[in-house]
Structure formats: C-alpha cells, structure tokens
Amino acid sequence: MKEIKTKKGRRRRKKKNRQRYRIGSIAFGILFLSCALFLIISYGKQKQAEREYTSLRSEEPCVTVGQIAMRTGIAAVSAAEKEEIPHSDAPHLENTIDFSALQEKNADIYAWIQIPGTLVDYPVLQHPTDRLYYLNHTIDGTAGLPGSIYSEAIHPKDFSAPMTVLYGHNMRNDTMFGSLHDYEDPDKLTDAPYVYIYLPDKTLIYQIFAAVRFSDTYLPDYCDYEKESDFMTFVKVLCSSPGNINETVEVPYGSRLLMMSTCIGNAPNNRFLVGAVLIDEYEK
C-alpha cells in the first residue's frame, strides 16, 4: 500500500515539475520575444532618426568633408579681413542653412554645428524648460536614441556666454558626438581643428585646443566663468586632464569657449570633452 502511495506521489511531483517547466518555458519565451520586439522597435526608431538627420543635411547644403577646397561657396579671406582678424586662418564657409524651414520642423532648432573632418554635422536644439529633454528625444520629438545635439536653456542661443556646453550621445556608429572620440588621436587636433556654428544671422568659428577625459561634473556650475581667476583655473584644469592639447592655441581670459561633451563607454563617471575657443565670426 505504501509503495502504491509512493508511486502516486512521485507521479504527482513529476507532473508538477513538468507544469512548472512548461510555465517557466512560456514565461521565458514571452520575455525573450518582448526583449526582441523592444530591440527591433528601438533599432527602427534609431534608424528612422538617422534618416531624418541625413535628410536635413541633404536639404541644408553645408560644406561637407572633402569639399572644403572645392566648394565655390567658400569665401576667400581677404588681406583686409586678415588684418582685422589676424589670429584666424580658418576658411569662411558659406552659411546656407534655412532656419525658417528647420524651425517649421521643430521650433527648438536654433543653430547648426559642423566639424569638417568628422561626422559632426547636425542641428542644435534647446528645450525651453526641460534641460534633459533632447538627451533622449530626436528632432521630431521621438523618444529614444540617438537623441539630439543640444544645449540647456541656461546658455544664450547666440553663444555669447563665456562657456557654452553642447551635449550629444557617443553612438557606436560614430553618429551624433561619437566621432569626437577621433580626437583621442593627437594628430586630429591639427587635421580637423575648426568647429563651425551656424546661426540665423552669422557664423562662429572655434578652434579646438583640448580633447580630454574629464569628470562628469556639471560644467555650468563648475565655476564662475565671468571671473578671471575661475576662468583661467578651469582652462588649466581642463588642459591638465588626460588627453590631447594643442598648446599653440591661445585661450586667454575673455575668450568664449565651446565645450562638446559626450560619454565614454567604459567610464560612466567621466565625460569626453572637446574644448574649442572662438577665433572668428562673420555675418551670414
């Protein structure tokens, strides 16, 4: 009698184990399919955003990599202009951005950044209230990667502050600010030294002087950039950080800095900063 009960008990346990196994397999399958679906949707959104940015670049005929010496739209710098701005040998590129058309797509677009010699060639956005909105929203408002190139509302849109920070994701395919990591090669600072910021009424030219690993401190609160001692201390700390420095570029007090910030894949508590100083500006 005991043997019969024991056999029945074993059968019940086996049956329960099989049920648990089936339930576990079904749950795992649902989880796997959910993850796969999420990845597919995320990848689709990312590719759609990349197509949107590519479309914008094709609509806005900025000078692209490899065309600087050929494009007839490049304005030659005259001798008189060089006398007015003796420190700038950067070519004046034609500002052909149609900001009216861009702002019909998104009113938060206020500038365009281009770094000839890299893949950086994007609109710049600023949300009026949510400083992190464009970290995870594309220009059409879609949530998720690759986000946008953006600044925070603390920074004037005419880049008149002593220090302006632009943020962008470090994408694996080098889009957004991913190609800033090219400046880990010291030769890149001289091969691709200029940053162009196109505004509705003028163009700003910056020269890159630093590409370093920095802490993830919130740069706008790092110091009072209006004070000479604070400004020069920041420049000194920046140029003492691990990375590459172009020591031929002067960064005196009173300069206007552009800091481009992106993440470092294996260092979540650090940021890769590319620092540039304003060397020229001209009307559109």
Can you name each region flagged by the protein language model?
Residues F32-K284:
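Solvent-exposed, non-transmembrane regions of membrane-associated and secreted proteins
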Residues M1-R20:
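N-terminal Lys/Arg-rich, disordered targeting/topogenic segments
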Residues R22-L33:
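Hydrophobic H-region at the start of alpha-helical membrane spans
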